[in-house]
């Protein structure tokens, strides 16, 4: 063999040796793939500059590069090295990838990118667990096309360590785009740049939000942080600005600026809608625009005392009374109170046709409104019911119970909401001495349309956040000590009182409900503040007036409307509206918007109470059909129908068998009802008792409706008091209403006698 033939034999031997090494690598890779997890080729681990960043600190990357490496449109489906999509990953690999993605987005430190240098690989830390990085040899790079394993840094075992190329003593960095599976790099067209601009912009926005907040959040949804109690949003002089309460200001300017920066332009928030709404009138510029955002605190009680009455929401519309008693009767004797029959609506239901509509229906007692009230004989039954209910962790007083509703061929299981009431939640005063001294009516406002989950402490926090320091909060309850949706709030300062009166309405937004709470001045029975001689009939809540008026003075001051402002009169109740010191004081009233007709009033926003005490007879005058006539906001254009007969519905109408079998108070015979068609003026003058006994000054659980005073019918356009009839409508500001008290009446028996006799009819014209 000559020396010229030796160079010819070396390539053949090298080729055979390379072929053996390739077969050996294929066999080893096959065995390795069976024991190790399959790694997507697109997540290629490239060599990291260890001297620059360290072995345990790979070069920082961006989310954009990581996303782009998962999308390779230049690889065809028939290619051997086709990318494995995200849907081909196992569950563990998906979870690991998502964790690494979060680490890259949250803990990323941006570095300066050198022009002309490719972006480092984004998945080096992820694949470092599975495949060790190996440097490919020069011979493999020049003589062979890279296999699928060479993409992960794998090379022939017999490649000498000294033959690996070095650039300045440092390993050469490569990226997945530069490798491109051994193909030549193609220049990206202008279309590719246009398509990637949107993705790049979204990625940069995502990284900004993540870096600011510390956790991944959606891009198009602005983060809304809630304080421990809430925040208030009210309009200012400029329609494009809003101001927040002290609670919302505590978050600082950083939160406000970030919230404005990352709010989507396509998302119209409630605040923007309220700002863009034009004012309804100059006098009502601040009304119906304040909103409180917050969360109800979790309730925690020690040995609570529950009301025997509970709210049951979400019941089927065709459920029967028998089905309800069958579901709740296992906890104790109970009765059903249907919507519209409770105390706060009973006074206004003078139309007998609407009352008999339920009895004429196919389903006797159908709950068309979707809720009912259950009244138990013993409060311990309520505690037993709550033990069988499910409750959300950290809930604010909502419970859930499953009832059975019988269908034609099957039995339906329906989950309903239970809202109990703890009697101690009806009052909240920071200073207990106020219960003995009494509240100041000149700093007290009336609130109506309260939600059933709003306790006195919750209302105290809301009003204090919105308007100022609150002294005491009292909620009105019925004879079962269940709230009727109204209450009174006493402020410490007059400034907070006037601010609440000027606001008029307050929107309460929580994760559980949204409610529009009404705020009115707490009125007293007093004389007109203009003439100081006549009794006041109405109250003007406009800040320029803010005084009591009689009929004559109101017509003189507001007859022409020279100032161009809106002056809405609020009807003054009777003399019983004076503040009473004690926990049993109840107002039992609410008011409604003047623009809202009575036919469209929802039962949840029309709270008018009529508390009937079984121990005393009730004097009832002509009841008003319009609920807004009972307290404020009666316009001159509204028509009133005066009926000559009083309509009274008992709390429940059980069958005679039920009345015999049960003996608790709500099934006792209804009290005696008297109708007096004589016009009455307030305050009333009672006839002194024959035996000199004291006349009862008030009854905490009763009220009465009275006809208009005779002085009102002094024009030809109005009817006289002698020709009142159901067929003849008349214009009327509103009915005189006893504000939770009975008129003064004398009884034949003394105060110590157990038997009650019929009262003498007092002469109200004295």
UniProtKB/Swiss-Prot annotation:
- Record key words, sorted: RNA-binding
Q: Where is the composition biased (Low complexity)?
A: 589-602
Is RNA-binding one of the keywords UniProt gives this record?
A: yes
Annotated RRM domain residues:
310-332
**Which InterPro entries does this UniProt record tie to the protein?**
CEBP_ZZ (IPR032296), CEBP_ZZ_sf (IPR038446), CPEB (IPR034819), CPEB1_RRM1 (IPR034977), Nucleotide-bd_a/b_plait_sf (IPR012677), RBD_domain_sf (IPR035979), RRM_dom (IPR000504)
Please list the disulfide bridges. Answer: none
- A single BP term in Gene Ontology: negative regulation of cytoplasmic translation
Q: Where are the transmembrane segments?
A: none
The entry lists its GO molecular-function terms as: mRNA 3'-UTR binding; mRNA regulatory element binding translation repressor activity; ribosome binding; translation factor activity, RNA binding
Q: Where is the composition biased (Polar residues)?
A: 233-256, 276-289
Region Disordered, annotated ranges: 1-35, 131-179, 216-299, 578-602
GO cellular component annotations of the record: cytoplasm; neuron projection; nucleus; synapse
Concerning SUPFAM superfamilies, the annotation shows: RNA-binding domain, RBD
Top-rank lineage group of the source organism: Eukaryota
Entries under PANTHER family matching the protein: CYTOPLASMIC POLYADENYLATION ELEMENT BINDING PROTEIN CPEB, CYTOPLASMIC POLYADENYLATION ELEMENT-BINDING PROTEIN 1
Q: What job does the chain carry out?
A: Cytoplasmic polyadenylation element binding protein that binds to and regulates the translation of specific mRNAs.
Spell out the protein name for this chain. Cytoplasmic polyadenylation element-binding protein 3
User: What is the native source organism of this protein?
Assistant: Caenorhabditis remanei (Caenorhabditis vulgaris)
Q: What is the lineage of its organism?
A: Eukaryota, Metazoa, Ecdysozoa, Nematoda, Chromadorea
Q: By which gene is this protein encoded? A: cpb-3
């Amino acid at each position: 063999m000559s020396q010229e033939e030796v160079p010819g034999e070396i390539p053949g031997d090298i080729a055979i040796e390379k072929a053996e090494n390739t077969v050996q690598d294929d066999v080893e890779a096959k065995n390795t793939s069976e024991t190790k997890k399959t790694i997507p080729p697109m997540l290629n681990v490239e060599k990291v500059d260890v001297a620059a960043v360290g072995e345990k600190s790979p070069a920082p990357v961006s989310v954009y590069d990581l996303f782009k490496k998962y999308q390779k449109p230049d690889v065809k489906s028939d290619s051997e090295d086709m990318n494995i999509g995200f849907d081909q990953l196992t569950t563990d690999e998906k979870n690991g990838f998502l964790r690494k993605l979060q680490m890259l987005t949250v803990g990323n430190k941006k570095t300066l990118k050198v022009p002309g240098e490719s972006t480092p690989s984004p998945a080096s830390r992820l694949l470092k667990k599975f495949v060790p990085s190996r440097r490919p040899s020069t011979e493999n790079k020049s003589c062979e096309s890279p296999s699928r394993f060479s993409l992960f840094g794998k090379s022939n075992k017999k490649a000498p360590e000294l033959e690996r190329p070095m650039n300045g003593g440092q390993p050469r960095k490569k990226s997945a785009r530069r490798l491109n599976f051994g193909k030549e790099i193609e220049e990206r067209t202008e279309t590719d740049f246009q398509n990637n601009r949107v993705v790049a912009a979204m990625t940069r926005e995502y990284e900004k939000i993540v870096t600011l907040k510390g956790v991944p959040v959606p891009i198009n949804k602005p983060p809304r942080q809630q304080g421990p109690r809430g925040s208030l949003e009210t309009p200012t002089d400029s329609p494009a600005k809003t101001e927040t309460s002290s609670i919302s200001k505590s978050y600082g300017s950083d939160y406000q600026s970030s919230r404005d920066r990352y709010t989507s332009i396509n998302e119209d928030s409630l605040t923007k809608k309220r700002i863009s709404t034009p004012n309804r009138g100059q006098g009502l510029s601040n009304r119906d625009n304040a909103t409180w955002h917050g969360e109800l605190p979790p309730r925690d009680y020690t040995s609570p005392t529950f009301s025997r009455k509970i709210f049951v929401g979400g019941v089927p519309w065709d459920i029967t009374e028998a089905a309800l008693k069958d579901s709740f009767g296992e906890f104790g004797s109970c009765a059903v109170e249907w919507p519209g029959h409770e105390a706060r609506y009973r006074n206004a239901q003078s139309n007998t046709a609407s009352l008999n509509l339920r009895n004429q229906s196919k389903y006797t007692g159908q709950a068309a409104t979707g809720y009912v009230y259950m009244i138990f004989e013993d409060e311990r039954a309520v505690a037993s019911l709550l033990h069988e209910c499910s409750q959300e962790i950290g809930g604010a007083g909502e419970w859930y119970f499953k009832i059975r509703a019988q269908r034609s061929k099957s039995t339906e299981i329906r989950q309903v909401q239970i809202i109990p009431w703890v009697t101690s939640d009806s009052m909240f005063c920071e200073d207990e001495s106020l219960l003995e001294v009494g509240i100041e009516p000149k700093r007290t406002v009336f609130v109506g349309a309260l939600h059933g989950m709003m306790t006195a402490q919750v209302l105290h926090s809301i009003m204090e956040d919105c308007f100022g320091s609150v002294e005491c909060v009292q909620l009105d309850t019925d004879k079962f000590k269940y709230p009727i949706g109204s209450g009174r709030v006493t402020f410490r300062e007059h400034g907070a009182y006037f601010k609440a009166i000027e606001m008029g309405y307050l929107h309460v937004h929580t994760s559980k409900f949204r409610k529009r709470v009404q705020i009115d001045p707490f009125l007293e029975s007093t004389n007109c503040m203009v003439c100081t001689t006549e009794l006041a009939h109405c109250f003007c809540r406009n800040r320029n007036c803010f005084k009591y008026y009689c009929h004559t003075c109101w017509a003189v001051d507001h007859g022409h409307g020279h100032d161009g402002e809106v002056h809405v009169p609020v009807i003054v109740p009777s003399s019983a509206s004076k503040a009473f010191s004690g926990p049993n004081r109840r107002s039992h009233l609410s008011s409604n918007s003047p623009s809202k007709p009575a036919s469209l009033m929802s039962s949840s926003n029309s709270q008018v109470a009529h508390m009937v005490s079984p121990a005393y007879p009730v004097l009832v005058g002509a009841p008003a059909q319009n609920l807004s006539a009972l307290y404020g906001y009666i316009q001159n254009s509204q028509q009133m129908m005066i009926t000559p007969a009083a309509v009274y519905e008992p709390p429940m109408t059980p069958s005679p068998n039920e009345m015999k079998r049960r003996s608790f108070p709500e099934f006792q015979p209804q009290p005696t009802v008297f109708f007096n068609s004589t016009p009455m003026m307030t305050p009333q003058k009672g006839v002194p008792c024959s035996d000199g006994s004291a006349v009862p000054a008030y009854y905490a659980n009763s009220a009465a409706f009275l006809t208009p005073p005779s002085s009102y019918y002094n024009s030809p356009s109005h009817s006289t008091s002698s020709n009142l009839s159901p067929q003849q409508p008349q214009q009327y500001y509103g009915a005189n209403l006893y504000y939770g008290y009975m008129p003064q009446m004398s009884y034949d028996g003394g105060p110590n006698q157990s038997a009650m006799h019929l009262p003498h009819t007092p002469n109200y014209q004295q």
